[in-house]
Amino acid sequence: GCTVLHGHGGFVIGSEMSSGARNIYVNNCLFNGTDTGLRLKSTRGRGGIVENIYVENINMVDIKGDAFTFDLYYANKPVAGKADSTTSEADAVPPVTEETPCFRNLFISNITCQGAKRAIYFNGLPEMPLDNLQLKNSLFVSEKGAELKYAKNILFDNVKIVNSQGNRLVKNNVENLTEE
């Protein structure tokens, strides 16, 4: 296990992902006062496949931003005119190429977060949504709930989000979200 105090993130993968990241296991950590808890990040043009990531038994306290974030628009660097946050959904979505980042097969369990700005933020790409993410047996106490964009095959199994502001869960272009 590990203890992370007052850093940018407790556990971070990215943003330069051209070689990808595979088969990573993180267990038994404490993140106290970090900017984010778990963060995986990339953007168009960096490519790479991030897959088979296992994270379990994580305690977070006083996270300044998101407890758990996957962001494929990292650093607000979307490609203009590609149906991203700065354009219309009617604009053409770019084709998938070797420069398109891909995040899939992520297995997260036994997360406890006592205090964060937002519990969960998933922000995939229209042309490459986040795919096959399982979050199990977790509790998030935060100001804001969860926001999911461009994601598919998501399982929240025994996930409790206790937020003091806004909706518990906001979805935009999410396919096959199961809550048990």
Where on the chain are the PLM-derived regions?
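Extracellular/periplasmic carbohydrate-active domains that bind, remodel
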Residues: 1-180
